Amino acid sequence: MNVAETYEPTPIIFTDNAAAKVKSLIEDEGNDELSLRVFVTGGGCSGFQYGFSFDEAVNEDDTIVEKDGVRLVVDSLSYQYLVGAEVDFREGLEGAQFVIKNPNASTTCGCGSSFSI
């Protein structure tokens, strides 16, 4: 008798640095209803690109990752490309930015904002 295995995808990782930056930006805005929305769109030099925005709305099919009282929200279409990815915030010589380490991306462009699968 075969037993079916249930596959649970690795969730999106929301790092401490990213959560702290989101918290700081939300405090600056003075609106506790805001969440960081991460999404994938077509475009960029590699075929897909990441996008970030602040959003008050949370849709029924959104995935929510909460950390330290702030939320990261991903729509269901983008989630399939971001399963197992890490959302981080980095400050360096090239500036300060949210970055995504995506194990699903087979190639990325030099700036890291677009990818292909």
UniProtKB/Swiss-Prot annotation:
Task: Locate the transmembrane regions by residue number.
Answer: none
In terms of superkingdom, the source organism counts as: Bacteria
What does the cofactor section's free text say about binding? Answer: Binds 1 iron-sulfur cluster per subunit.
Q: Which residues bind iron-sulfur cluster?
A: C45, C109, C111
Its required cofactor(s), as named, are: iron-sulfur cluster
Signal sequence interval, chain numbering: none
Q: What does the UniProt keyword field contain?
A: Iron, Iron-sulfur, Metal-binding
The record ties this protein, via InterPro entries, to: FeS_biogenesis (IPR000361), FeS_cluster_insertion (IPR016092), FeS_cluster_insertion_CS (IPR017870), FeS_cluster_insertion_RrpA (IPR023063), HesB-like_dom_sf (IPR035903)
Kindly give the SUPFAM superfamilies that the UniProt entry links to this protein: HesB-like domain (SSF89360)
Instruction: Provide the coiled-coil residue spans.
Output: none
Which GO molecular function, any one, fits this protein according to its record? iron ion binding
User: Could you tell me the Gene Ontology terms of the biological process aspect for this record?
Assistant: iron-sulfur cluster assembly
Xref: Pfam families? Fe-S_biosyn (PF01521)
Q: What does this protein do?
A: Required for insertion of 4Fe-4S clusters for at least IspG.
What is said about its interaction partners and assembly? Homodimer.
Q: Which family does it belong to?
A: Belongs to the HesB/IscA family.
What protein name applies here?
Answer: Iron-sulfur cluster insertion protein ErpA
**In which organism is this protein found?**
Hahella chejuensis (strain KCTC 2396)
Q: Gene behind this chain?
A: erpA
